[in-house]
Amino acid sequence: MKMLRKTLCAMTLGAATLAPVMSTTVFAAPVAASEQQATNNLVKQLSNIRTLSANFEQTTKATSAGKAPQKKGLTGQHMNQTFKGVMKVARPGKFFWETTSPAKQTIVTSGKTVWIYDPDLQQAVRQSLDEQVANTPALLLSGNTSQIMKSYRVTQPDKGKTYYTLYPKVKDSAFQSLTISFGANKAPSLMILQDSLGQTTYVRFNNVKLNPSIASSTFNFTPPKGTDIIDQ
């Protein structure tokens, strides 16, 4: 279970869309947006989000049963396990991500410090929200939109549809590509992340509420008494 928790944290912070489902009926060839257009369109899409709340389902799958899991010390069964929970976002920089099943874990930041809390292990990791952490997929929805061009190369395969694929510009990034798709309500509906180990992480959002009222205390964290605090 401890390894599962470490994997969940890695998927969420350092590694965290489903590839958009495309119709097999072809009416016309899609016209891709230029990189500048794609970036501008994504920034505009994200700018609609002041606050956001949703339930999520997150599943990671390996392209081969033995390859990636062996490197991570996980079995194929673990790699295909689905995590469920809730997330809340408030711009700028506030993020709450709580997994409720099968292992409970909370990741929260008020914009300066990231806390990763595991109640079963009675352990909390405290990490500074530096530029590297701020550019991870899980914080894309709450981060500074002006940094997108600096951190990612953005593509929009069909400029008539609201899904985008982002490629990190840094060479040592934990993921190779990130696809994010938005629904008719202008809120994110799903994300897919592909990493260098041949693994694909799918995050589906449901019960999405765009710009709801969220208490500021949601993004504050105080470790319970007796919690082992680890600074990174």
Please state what every model-predicted region is.
Residues 26-37:
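Cleaved targeting-peptide boundary
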Residues 86-136, 201-202:
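An acidic-aromatic
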Residues 2-14:
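Bacterial N-terminal signal peptides that target proteins for export
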Residues 63, 96, 103-105, 123, ...:
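Short beta-strands and strand-coil junctions in structured, solvent-facing domains, enriched
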Residues 15-27:
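C-terminal segment of classical bacterial N-terminal signal peptides
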Residues 125, 147-152, 157-232:
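Gly/Pro-enriched, hydrophobic low-complexity segments
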Residues 47-111:
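N-terminal mature ectodomain segment of secretory-pathway/periplasmic proteins
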Residues 133-147:
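Short, solvent-exposed helix-to-loop capping segments enriched in aromatics
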